[in-house]
Regions:
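PLP-dependent aminotransferase class I/II
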Residues: 1-153
Length: 153
């Protein structure tokens, strides 16, 4: 972002969004199916303390826009991401905290104690999830995550 920049959607983006809005329930249900599959099939790793699964508060409704897992630390996260990449799974770390991003370092300052921001960001992995994901693709992702985590932890 810089001076004079405009981030309003153009006509092409609006047309693309409109097509998605017309099928919003179908898209959401497809993504929810994948989300539930991941959650159910990774629950054993969670029960064994090898990773943490997403928490959706009771008063909230998920649209399944992403599925993440939290691993014990950045070392395990790095190994799991490498394993997934080597096995054709496009998983990524979730975010870089603003205070440690280049612009944050240059322009900002962290206020208070960094009790959670950095450590939590170093544990998160986002798994691939998309509309129309097949049962085979879902199982491939889960199998690779299980293999990677069991090899590391």
């Amino acid at each position: 972002m810089d001076l004079g920049s405009s981030y309003l959607p153009g006509e092409l983006q609006a047309a693309y969004l409109y097509g998605q809005l017309e099928k919003v329930e179908e898209i959401k249900e497809s993504r929810m199916k994948t989300w539930r599959f991941f959650y159910e099939n990774l629950s054993e790793l969670s029960a064994n303390g090898k990773l943490e699964l997403p928490i959706i508060p009771a008063e909230c409704i998920s649209n399944a826009h992403m599925f993440y897992v939290k691993l014990p630390d950045i070392g395990v996260r790095t190994k799991v991401l490498e394993y997934l990449k080597n096995n054709g799974i496009g998983a990524v770390f979730h975010y870089i905290p603003l205070h440690s991003a280049p612009a944050g370092i240059r322009l900002g300052a962290f206020v208070g104690k960094d009790k959670f921001t950095t450590s939590e960001s170093e544990r998160l992995i986002r798994l691939p999830i998309w509309y129309g994901m097949t049962d085979i693709e879902r199982a491939t992702v889960v199998d690779a995550v299980v293999e990677a985590v069991n090899a590391c932890c």
